[in-house]
């Protein structure tokens, strides 16, 4: 267990959710995104802490026809001031917050 400056974190404890509509993503969660019914938007936290991590999975393998849009909520993604559109079938990736200059970075694919 460690303190990240805001909350106590327990390593190895992970939270999973299945989503099929637009949602506000929470730090430390893993999302199985089902876009069978149409594209969805995940809105990132507005004030994340350094090292905050969120993971997304294309559980239905439909991002190619119904994309996941990751709304940056004021912070850069990959250093860019644009939302991230993911349209690769079967995509799975994590975003980690690196600070206000470069914002959310793709940590793993």
Which residues make up each language-model segment?
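Extracellular disulfide-bonded cysteine-rich modules/repeats
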Residues: 1-3, 88-99
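Exposed extracellular interaction/assembly regions and N-terminal maturation sites
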Residues: 7-71, 100-109
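Short edge-strand/loop segments of extracellular domains
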Residues: 71-80
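Beta-strand-rich interaction surfaces with strong enrichment in secreted/lumenal proteins
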Residues: 81-86
């Amino acid at each position: 267990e460690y303190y990240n400056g805001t909350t106590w974190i327990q390593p190895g404890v992970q939270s999973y959710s299945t989503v099929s509509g637009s949602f506000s993503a929470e730090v430390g969660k893993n999302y199985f995104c089902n876009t069978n019914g149409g594209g969805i938007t995940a809105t990132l936290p507005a004030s994340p802490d350094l090292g905050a991590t969120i993971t997304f999975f294309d559980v239905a393998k439909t991002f190619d026809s119904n994309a996941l849009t990751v709304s940056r909520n004021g912070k850069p993604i990959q250093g860019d001031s644009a939302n991230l559109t993911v349209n690769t079938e079967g995509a799975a990736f994590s975003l980690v917050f690196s600070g206000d200059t470069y914002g959310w970075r793709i940590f793993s694919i």
